[in-house]
Design a protein with these regions (language model features):
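Catalytic domains of carbohydrate-active enzymes that cleave complex glycans
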Residues: 32-33, 47-151
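Catalytic-core regions of glycoside hydrolase
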Residues: 1-48
Length: 151
């Protein structure tokens, strides 16, 4: 919940999708070695329809699951949530940050990352800014690898 009046990243359906992407920028800032999410398919009742009743413990919508049963969508197998796809984008952002660091651009990376998220309680909630910074990271990677333009 809120800590001393500060917000942090909440990972439920009801919150902006950036909440699933930006923790990886903080992971870079704090040089954390990994991230563990407690469950991706936790349904407290096996007969419950998570498509129409998404609450975990009757209050946290989408908490504990990133995959849904595909049967309701006519798919034989699991369906990935949009939250999971945004989480993947965050992991890809972290890969860009780490690659640039390995290419000798730590100062550039640190400066760019600080523009997005400098702590668990302070981040930029403008999605456009995230895309612009990611494009700048991609361009710098291409330059360092001797390629002319990022695609």
């Amino acid at each position: 919940q809120k800590v001393g009046g500060l917000s942090t990243f909440f990972w439920q359906i009801d919150f902006p999708s950036l909440n699933f992407r930006l923790p990886f920028w903080v992971i870079w800032e704090d040089q954390i070695q990994g991230m563990l999410y407690w469950s991706t398919v936790h349904w407290s009742d096996p007969v419950r329809d998570v498509w129409t009743d998404p609450a975990f413990r009757n209050r946290y919508n989408g908490e504990g699951y990133f995959f849904y049963p595909g049967t309701e969508a006519g798919i034989a197998g699991p369906v990935a949530s949009i939250r999971l796809k945004v989480l993947r984008e965050g992991i890809e952002d972290l890969a860009y940050l780490k690659l640039l660091d390995q290419l000798g651009e730590r100062e550039f990376v640190t400066t760019q990352a600080a523009k997005i998220a400098s702590s668990w309680w302070k981040w930029n909630d403008d999605p456009q800014q995230v895309y612009l910074i990611r494009a700048a990271l991609a361009q710098k990677i291409m330059e360092k690898q001797g390629k002319s333009e990022a695609t």
